[in-house]
C-alpha cells in the first residue's frame, strides 16, 4: 500500500513569467512527488479550463491562488488516505469532485498538478523511474519536432504561421537526434544573422525574425540544414504548426504578413503545394478547429503522404477524437496534458489514436516549467514523437536532457523509430 498522507500546493512561475500551479504529494512511506501545470498561448476553445484569479492588481489577473486553494482544501480532503498507485481512481475521483465537463470549477491546472504529483510519488514509492511506472506500451524514444522558427502567437514578428520545426528522422538515436537539432539551430542563427535578420528567440526558444514571407521560413531552414552538413528529406524532415484558428475570421483565413485572404480550400491547397515543393512531413492545425469540412478535404487530399495533426481540433479529448476518427478527420493527434487535465485521460487519448491507426505527438505548451513529465510520458506510451521546443531555453532543454538520461538507462531497449514514427503514411 502507498497511501496519500498529505498534499500541498503553491503558486509558482512559468517560462513566460505567469503564475502556475505546483503540487506536492507525500505518501505514508515518505515518498514524495511533484507536478507543475503548463499553460498555452494559442488555445483551443474546447480545452479544459485553467482557473485564474482575475485580480487585475496581481499578475494582471493571471494569479492561480484559487486553484492552489482548491488543492489545499477540497482535493486534499478527497485524496488523503487513497491508494496512490491507482492513478485512474485518483484522477476519476478528482473529475467527479469537480463535477463539470471541462474542469472549470476546481481548475484543470489544479487537477493536473495533483495528477502528475501522485504519479511521481507512486513511482518513487515503487522504486521506479516515472517512464517505467507509467509504461503502457513498448518503450520508444520519440522523434522530436524542434521548433526553430517561431511566429504567430509565439512571437512578435511578421510570420503568420506559428511554428516551423525540424525532425531528425535520419538520426540513429535520441542523443544524436538532439545533436543534429542543436547543430542546425546554430547554423540557422548564422544564416539569419548573415541575412541581417534578428536572432532573438520566441516563447519556445526558436528564432523570431521578421521574414519577407511565410515561405521564407522554410527556405532559411533548408539553408541551415545544408550548412550544418545534413540532407533535407533524408536526415531531416520539416514539420509545421499553422495554428490556423488564430488566422480564422468570418469563415476565411487571413495571412497578415502577405495581406492575403484564403478560403478553406485555398488554405489546404497552399499547404499542399508546400508539401509537394519541400520535405514537409507533418502539418498541425492547418485549418480552424471548427473547419471540419476543410480538415476532411485536407485528409482526403494529403492524408496518405502527410501527418495531419489535430491540436485545437481535438484538444487531447478522447470524445472529440472519437468523433474525428469516425468522420475521417486528420490522421494524428497532438497530446497536451493540460488540455484534458489528467494523466488517465491523456493515456486514453493516446491509446485511442493508436487503435485507430492515428499517430500521437506528445507536446509541451508555450508556457512551460522545469517539469519533465512529458518526456517520460512520450517514452512510456511509445508515442514515437515529441514536440518540446527549440534547442535553447532551459524550460525546453530540460525535456531533451531527460530523454538523453532515459535513453542511457534503457540501453538496448531504447528504440529510436526515425521515419517509422510515421507508421500511417505511405
Curated annotation (Swiss-Prot):
Which InterPro entries does the entry mention? Enolase, Enolase-like_C_sf, Enolase-like_N, Enolase_C, Enolase_CS, Enolase_N
UniProt: Mg(2+) binding residues: 241, 284, 311
Q: Where does (2R)-2-phosphoglycerate bind?
A: 162, 336, 365-366, 387
Catalytic positions?
A: 204, 336
Keywords for this entry?
Cytoplasm, Glycolysis, Lyase, Magnesium, Metal-binding, Secreted
Q: Which cofactors does this protein require?
A: Mg(2+)
Q: Which GO terms describe its biological process?
A: glycolytic process
Q: What class of enzyme is it?
A: lyase
Any S-S bridges, and between which cysteines?
A: none
Localized where? Cytoplasm; Secreted; Cell surface
Catalytic activity, reaction form: (2R)-2-phosphoglycerate = phosphoenolpyruvate + H2O
Cofactor annotation remark:
Binds a second Mg(2+) ion via substrate during catalysis.
Which Pfam family, just one, is annotated for this protein? Enolase_N
User: Where is this protein primarily located?
Assistant: cytoplasm
Pathway(s) where this gene product acts: Carbohydrate degradation; glycolysis; pyruvate from D-glyceraldehyde 3-phosphate: step 4/5
Which molecular function terms from Gene Ontology are attached?
magnesium ion binding; phosphopyruvate hydratase activity
> Could you say which EC number(s) this protein's record lists?
4.2.1.11
- Listed GO cellular component terms? cell surface; extracellular region; phosphopyruvate hydratase complex
Assembly notes: Component of the RNA degradosome, a multiprotein complex involved in RNA processing and mRNA degradation.
Q: Family per UniProt?
A: Belongs to the enolase family.
HAMAP family attached to this UniProt entry: Enolase
Q: What's this protein's name?
A: Enolase
Organism of origin is Hydrogenovibrio crunogenus (strain DSM 25203 / XCL-2)
Q: What lineage is on file? A: Bacteria, Pseudomonadati, Pseudomonadota, Gammaproteobacteria, Thiotrichales
Amino acid at each position: 500500500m502507498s497511501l496519500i498522507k498529505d498534499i500541498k500546493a503553491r503558486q509558482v512561475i512559468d517560462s513566460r513569467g505567469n503564475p502556475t500551479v505546483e503540487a506536492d504529494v507525500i505518501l505514508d512511506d515518505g515518498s514524495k512527488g511533484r507536478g507543475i501545470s503548463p499553460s498555452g498561448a494559442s488555445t483551443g476553445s474546447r480545452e479544459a479550463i485553467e482557473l485564474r484569479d482575475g485580480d487585475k492588481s496581481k499578475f494582471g489577473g493571471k494569479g492561480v491562488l484559487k486553484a492552489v486553494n482548491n488543492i489545499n482544501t477540497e482535493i486534499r480532503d478527497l485524496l488523503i488516505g487513497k491508494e496512490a498507485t491507482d492513478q485512474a481512481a485518483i484522477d476519476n475521483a478528482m473529475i467527479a469532485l469537480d463535477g463539470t465537463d471541462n474542469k472549470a470549477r476546481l481548475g484543470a491546472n489544479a487537477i493536473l498538478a495533483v495528477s502528475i504529483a501522485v504519479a511521481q510519488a507512486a513511482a518513487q514509492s515503487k522504486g521506479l523511474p516515472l517512464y517505467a511506472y507509467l509504461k503502457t506500451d513498448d518503450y520508444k524514444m520519440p522523434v522530436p519536432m524542434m521548433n526553430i522558427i517561431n511566429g504567430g502567437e509565439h512571437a512578435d514578428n511578421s510570420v503568420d504561421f506559428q511554428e516551423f520545426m525540424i525532425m531528425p528522422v535520419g538520426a540513429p538515436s535520441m542523443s544524436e537526434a538532439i545533436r543534429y537539432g542543436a547543430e542546425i539551430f546554430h547554423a540557422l542563427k548564422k544564416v539569419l544573422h548573415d541575412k541581417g535578420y534578428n536572432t532573438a528567440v520566441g516563447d519556445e526558444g526558436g528564432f523570431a525574425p521578421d521574414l519577407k514571407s511565410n515561405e521564407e521560413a522554410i527556405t532559411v531552414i533548408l539553408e541551415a540544414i545544408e550548412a550544418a552538413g545534413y540532407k533535407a528529406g533524408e536526415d531531416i524532415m520539416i514539420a509545421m504548426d499553422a495554428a490556423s484558428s488564430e488566422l480564422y475570421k468570418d469563415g476565411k483565413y487571413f495571412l497578415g504578413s502577405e495581406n492575403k485572404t484564403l478560403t478553406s480550400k485555398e488554405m489546404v491547397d497552399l499547404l499542399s503545394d508546400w508539401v509537394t515543393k519541400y520535405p514537409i512531413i507533418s502539418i498541425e492545425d492547418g485549418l480552424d478547429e471548427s473547419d471540419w469540412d476543410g480538415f476532411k478535404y485536407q485528409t482526403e487530399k494529403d492524408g496518405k503522404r502527410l501527418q495531419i495533426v489535430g491540436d485545437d481540433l481535438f484538444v487531447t479529448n478522447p470524445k472529440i477524437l472519437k468523433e474525428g476518427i469516425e468522420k475521417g478527420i486528420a490522421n494524428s493527434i497532438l497530446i497536451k496534458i493540460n488540455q484534458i487535465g489528467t494523466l488517465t485521460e491523456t493515456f486514453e487519448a493516446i491509446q485511442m489514436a493508436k487503435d485507430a491507426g492515428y499517430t500521437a505527438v506528445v507536446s509541451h505548451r508555450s508556457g512551460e516549467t522545469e517539469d519533465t513529465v512529458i518526456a517520460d510520458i512520450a517514452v512510456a506510451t511509445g508515442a514515437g514523437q515529441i514536440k518540446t521546443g527549440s534547442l535553447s531555453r532551459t524550460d525546453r532543454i530540460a525535456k531533451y536532457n531527460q530523454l538523453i538520461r532515459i535513453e542511457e538507462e534503457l540501453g538496448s531497449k531504447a528504440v529510436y523509430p526515425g521515419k517509422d514514427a510515421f507508421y500511417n503514411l505511405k
